[in-house]
Swiss-Prot record:
The lineage of its organism: Bacteria, Pseudomonadati, Pseudomonadota, Gammaproteobacteria, Vibrionales. It comes from Aliivibrio fischeri (strain ATCC 700601 / ES114). Catalyzes the conversion of glucosamine-6-phosphate to glucosamine-1-phosphate. The active site is at 102 (phosphoserine intermediate). The gene is glmM. InterPro entries: A-D-PHexomutase_a/b/a-I, A-D-PHexomutase_a/b/a-I/II/III, A-D-PHexomutase_a/b/a-II, A-D-PHexomutase_a/b/a-III, A-D-PHexomutase_C, A-D-PHexomutase_C_sf, A-D-PHexomutase_CS, Alpha-D-phosphohexomutase_SF. This is Phosphoglucosamine mutase. Its cofactor is Mg(2+). GO terms for biological process: carbohydrate metabolic process; peptidoglycan biosynthetic process; UDP-N-acetylglucosamine biosynthetic process. Keywords: Isomerase, Magnesium, Metal-binding, Phosphoprotein. The modification Phosphoserine is found at residue 102.
Amino acid sequence: MAERKYFGTDGVRGLVGQAPITPDFVMKLGWAAGQVLAKQGTKKVIIGKDTRISGYMLESALEAGLAAAGLQAKFTGPMPTPAVAYLTQTFRAEAGIVISASHNPYYDNGIKFFSSEGTKLPDDVEMAIEAELDKPMTCVESALLGKASRLNDAAGRYIEFCKSTFPKELSLAGLKIVIDCANGATYHIAPNVFKELGAEIITIGCEPNGTNINHEVGATDVRALQAKVVEEKADFGVAFDGDGDRIIMVDEFGEKVDGDQIAYIIARDALRRGELKGGVVGTLMTNMGMEVALRNLGIPFVRSDVGDRYVMEKLLENNWLIGAENSGHVILLDKVTTGDAIVAALQVIASIVGSKMSLKELCDGMTMFPQILVNVRFAGENDPLESDAVKAAQADVEAKLGDNGRVLLRKSGTEPLIRVMVEGEDAELVTQYAQQIADAVKESC
């Protein structure tokens, strides 16, 4: 396959105002996507965004490009990424588009696409869009130009859908839950879902102002949530990222519960109910503790490349239903078509309520291996992963770990970073080994 120019592991992403996240490029991207995706005849495209201030500018640019291709833009306003996937299906739209850079800071933004089935686009479709981007932009005749309108009931539809995934015989009554919406797209959705199911809720990160998305709140920084759960003596806390496709939880003692543990809880509960189909898909970053815990339950486990799209591919390949990344993407194919943090949270809570166990107790069956991740900024021409010094450092650490640990080096798909991950039984040694490799990477950049 030809090398990509624009699409990364999660759409097109970058710093606002610099290529490719500029109004002129995004307008042409909308047009190019329209040329490739407009095959159903409905001519409708659902467009959602998170709470970044640049979302206003970029949705206008997308609208212009789609209109030039003869498509109708339907705006949801701030809306979680999985909500756009859901609404794309229910409105029988040609495609869904999300304007978001997910967990990144506010000055980044991105564009990602969903097919008419509510799934992320396969590689060949993204390459077809890139091919259209190399062509001169054209415009349909005036009578065929697209129009734009707003979907005023989008939030209500999605709230009802989320609630429908929670068992009707259960209730959240009596639970005190702290919800952290990262000042992002779930700020007006998640509190209503949990409140309407009966919980007492306390919110943080629910006051977006355009520039505070993911800032010291949300799934990538749970310190505020941890403190609030302990302060309020809550049963647990739930943190979402800026676009609502990642979830991290916090138990009653303020301890972090990541995507690996969440998937383990959901899979074990499905096994208990006799409803588990197949096994669980993790990634190269999934903690070895999850693999061991699932094996002890007799649940099959396989790893995919890093990225929720690759988790999805492996799920479909195996005809399984549960997949996750430790960063908090949790995919439950019996309920959704993409990672949905609110729906994943509800399944964990259903296990808490149904088993009458605490979140901490549900996590106790899985012992996490110490895992250290060091990010090294990479902006040079040379590929440090091809350096003899880096290869030697990796080989040395792998020899020392033997069968009791792992080393993973990879380039980030969304940022100019080399990620160095070392995992093993001894936290002190793992930290030392990770720094040894990271130092070699820095010297080779």
